[in-house]
Amino acid sequence: MDTHTTKLVAISLLLLLVISDYTRLMIQVHSYVPFCAYTYDYFSYCLDFLTGYYYKPGKKCCVHIVKLNIIAKHKKENPRLLCNCVEMMTRGYTPPMLADKIQQLPLLCNTHLSFPISSSMDCSTV
């Protein structure tokens, strides 16, 4: 092969890798969409508590946390997906969510969470 053909093959392979990575990323983002929609909707009932406006979570908050637990238990990958949605939602939220309120949420809602929420989540380990 001459150098022109070799360069063309190398560029084609590189382009194929870039497209492959982009496609994988789009599939991953697409898989978050339904989970994040539920997460944002259901978690919105808890924001007044999580940001410190209320001293305890409301009944609607706790009901929706139970619903998120059901979603988390439905498939093996759901806890990680929900964790990523919560992480994306809380990152940069103003006013910030209070770490102690996040930790109190399962206890005050009389439930055990099937997905992690904390101020220092690492969803890659879920």
From Swiss-Prot:
The keyword Transport applies. It comes from the Eukaryota. The keyword tRNA-binding does not apply. GO terms for molecular function: lipid binding. Disulfide bonds join C36-C85, C46-C61, C62-C109, C83-C123. One of its GO terms (biological process) is lipid transport. Keywords: Disulfide bond, Lipid-binding, Signal, Transport. Residues 1-20 form the signal peptide. Plant non-specific lipid-transfer proteins transfer phospholipids as well as galactolipids across membranes. May play a role in wax or cutin deposition in the cell walls of expanding epidermal cells and certain secretory tissues. Belongs to the plant LTP family. This is Non-specific lipid-transfer protein 13.
